[in-house]
Amino acid sequence: TKPENCEKIIQIKPDFIINTSAITDVDYCEKFKEQSYLVNVTGTKNLVKICKKLECKLIQISTDGIFNGKEENYKEDDEPKPVNYYGKTKLESENEVKNLNDYLILRTNLLYGYISKNTLASRSTYLKRTNFFMWVLTELQQNNSLKIVNDQFSNPTLVDNLKKIIFDSLKKNLVGTFHSTDITCISRFSFAKEIAKKFGFPEHLITEISSKELDQYAPRPTKTCLDCSKIQKNGINLHTLDESLDSLFKVIQKEDPKLIS
């Protein structure tokens, strides 16, 4: 969003740019629309200008949040119908990226992964937010009970898997829009139960509630599971939730064993 930063990118002359920058807090976007637009849309517009000037590829990380959640297993060409301001900004940023000849839009959802205490301590206040997986695991480790919604479905995606998807897609020189998630469609409640089971915590600490009981500020789509068959047909390997949790278990067992029961 700052011209001086754009100039620095131009001086580097990259072969490609990966745009992971976004305000993703749905309620925050609904409350602070001007700032959210600046980061999510204006920032993307600036990167598009840079890529046009340098003739380099732009990889845009997008979201399931552009859909309204009323259909099953969304494909790339299904009509976007965002139900909140966050989704609207991400859709507008996608449309900006499509003005380029060489672009890659990767739609993902519910990104999660392990974040060490040292990493969290070094972050700014906003970035101290963790992710659904870390929140659930930390609460269970402290023997706290959790109320989790049972009517919001998506494909939880391990961030390390998305990283590999990005670079595999670059190697194959993919162009266009692709759904890029882990392949298990699951509710938040069931996801939390799977975390408890994998890491050895009592599942009875987790009880289910409906989204209405949360009284969230911004509306949420209910079921935004993505069909990833297009990217799989292009030779990109995807993972199940069980495979991803197994991978995380090994990492945490080595890095932070206190998080395992």
Residue ranges and their predicted role:
Residues 149, 165, 172-217, 223, ...:
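Mid/C-terminal beta-alpha module of Rossmann-like enzyme folds, strongest
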Residues 17-21, 58-64, 68, 106-108:
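SDR active-site strand-loop-helix element
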Residues 1-39, 50-52:
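NAD(P)H-binding glycine-rich loop region in Rossmannoid oxidoreductase-like domains
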Residues 60-73, 85-88, 111-115, 129:
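Conserved catalytic-site region of short-chain dehydrogenase/reductase
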Residues 222-261:
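C-terminal amphipathic/interface module of NAD(P)-dependent oxidoreductases
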Residues 98-153, 161, 167:
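NAD(P)-dependent short-chain dehydrogenase/reductase
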Residues 1, 31, 35-46, 80, ...:
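Glycine-rich NAD(P)-binding loop of the Rossmann-fold in SDR/ketoreductase-type enzymes
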Residues 45-81:
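Conserved Rossmann-fold NAD(P)-dependent oxidoreductase catalytic core, especially the SDR/UDP-sugar
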